[in-house]
């Protein structure tokens, strides 16, 4: 028998079972079909581009009250059964979008209702928009709005029958023990020690049976005895997993300040105007690091909650979640839900259900939190909006900023973007004044609250250090800065955006660099595990560097394999040798934060230390607020500057400016030391002088001349296959179709005063081979405002699918590697 799903994950009350559906049609005569009272558009839960559109099904009279938009249903599709989701309902078949020409007599009925509505009609409309905007299937987009734990699956059993499998993740119930009114007056016998312990434990309120058993080593018999006497009562209540994300971080306090700065007041006033106008306008809060943007968010949310609406807050890094959630919960209590990938499946389900039930009115989390079922959404906030982590890496490859803007327009609520280094796209739209039918407004917050000032930035020219005989990874200014931190018992942050011990090994005899057997990627050496690891596919090989006789060059057999470059592990070792033992050295990168709550524990360790150095990759550069940090050091600022990516400079500037902002956030002044071989680079100069225009003026001129965003929209179409020729041929066919299409339409573009979309390539990717697949891509540059996705979708359908070849479309692409 197949179980049905309820909105909150638990089985519905028992009703007529869903009969297994035969895999093939039966030869026996069929009973007369039940009358159909309406029609539904059903998106099949089969993620293939060939089935990207919804299919029409009839709603039998027996399901008329249960079939709603958002319901999961069981349907026949061809010679199989499938689960699907209702996205539209109409009484006439012709009123369903795209189904006006269908014959009602040929429409199959829905076989069963598998769940109550899991998403709203507005969510279904946003799904359609996402599917068209990002050239993704409807089922892929719909899954974003579904409760965690998986959707129902229809599987074929050994006997040839199709059956429904429900998700394994289920809610749990806690048993709570509490005193009855009579229980407060009950006096246990003198010899009933356990009863006295239980009653004393319950005097301050209900306690779970689990906690009582842990405290007093099994209280089950005592609870039963007092329950029979009417002294206590036991109730089952839904447990909300994921609510215990407590933190000892001092920066997690959400106490409101005595007064807001002028910049904070202006930002809050602009957000309030956008809220009252109710057009879905966008407000960009452009505030220097430490200017108090979070307090603006908290104050804006207070007004939204007072109006009876809800709010969604996105943060870019899991490492920021504990700090942010702590501040929000200290202000708004347990009405705050948290949603990110490090939660267990059960915790995500419970947090989702807290939102769906209305128990939580504020959601804080990563980009996926945007799709939580908040009722009457009144405000969306995206903190550090410039961060690339808001771009989804797999289909549907949406950008949270763009989806949030569409949601804000539909829900008629403001979208607030906050950053000390706003993206070029956000700044350009604010300069235009309008985009996507709504107003974009920029509000500056140029000062820090209180007596805090921006840190002093010093450039350590590594060329000069080398010419003076220094071979250390630390320049003289940085070493002196660390010594001052130790003397004053303060704290420092060191950024190095390369994890591992050394970025690669190199043969000293032939120059060979070992690469991954499955990817065209150099392997990174990890000292702790003595492994070479591929950071593209995750493969690893045990290895011992010279003079170990077991490790040899794969090309010439030499034993002279040298560790080249620096990784965070190697810098950590050097710090331990250089600094006193009583200085805590805490490394924070992808390797040290694999475990659950690892980010929070490391930050709490840093916060609690008397004197400490926090060493890490880019995850330490964003949003962290530690007033005791007086020194920020950048070990090598040049890694990201010369990558083959037009956004390389912007990313480098964002990273350096953000990490510089970790210094001097309290009463003590801050200092930033940036080590570089390129002190004349506009990125380095802009950070050193706290003048963004030095970089942005140069960068925007380069992009305007080369036609890159924000002056065009950029689409990356990627094909990959185990067969190199197949992938290259497939992407070549798409390129020909697009060029032919736009060449024919060129007069229409010119008459409209618009540029013609361009096709660059195809060419092999920078990382040509990954996970044993050869990768080729082409780039499309489209005028802003032209819906290029429709043309790309049409060409993909014309080419069709090719066995063994996969294709992806990345609209507004960020990853071009």
Map each language-model feature to its residues.
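Nucleotide-binding motor/catalytic cores of P-loop/tubulin-like NTPases across gene-expression machines
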Residues: 745, 751-756, 770-774, 786, ...
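Accessory, non-ATPase domains that flank or precede helicase/AAA+ motor cores in DNA-metabolism machines
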Residues: 1-419, 426, 432-452, 487, ...
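Short amphipathic alpha-helix segments
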Residues: 726-760
